[in-house]
Amino acid sequence: LGDKANGNSQYGVTIGDRASTGKGANAIAIGLMAKTSNEKVGGNSQTAVGVASYADGEGASAFGATANATGALATAVGRNSKALEKSASAFGDSASASAWGATALGVGSSAKADNSIAVGSQAVTEGRESTALGRRSYAGAQSATALGTGANASAIVSTAVGNGAKASEVGASALGNTAEASGRGSMAFGYASKASAVDALATGSNANASSMNAV
């Protein structure tokens, strides 16, 4: 239904000028140039709703102008959102989930690694099973966790909790606004605390532990 609409899906629905459904069964394309396909990923039951939205893959769903869901069970919701792998989910304007099972929620959020979760405006995950929660938060290695505005956990199993907190070595933990843990296995607890040596522990506001095993 619509000028130059092209419906190829068995039991499918095609509504909108130049909207099109591929050969997969039960596909739905609604909106100007909305498109479902099974050319790249294959499968049935794709859904694309919105101007130039696109869905390809078994059960893939794209909602919003230029939303793109490419992967089995991928879900993209929001203008220019992208879910580009199996079971990936992207919610929000320009949100992007580009790895298997990844989840991105928030304007410009980006989940780039398998099973990672990025929540918040411009939050980013780049490590497998990592978590970033908060505006501009960043989790850059496997199992890293960053919680808070601008929190940054860039090493394997590192943890940064608090606005501007940073954990930059393997197993390091920084808890508190602007706390920094930059030694392997180090821990910094408290506002602006710093632990910069291996296994160092800094506890309290502005505390500083700069030698190995220091407390």
Name each model feature, range by range.
Residues 1-215:
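Glycine- and small/polar-enriched repetitive beta-structure motifs of secreted/surface proteins
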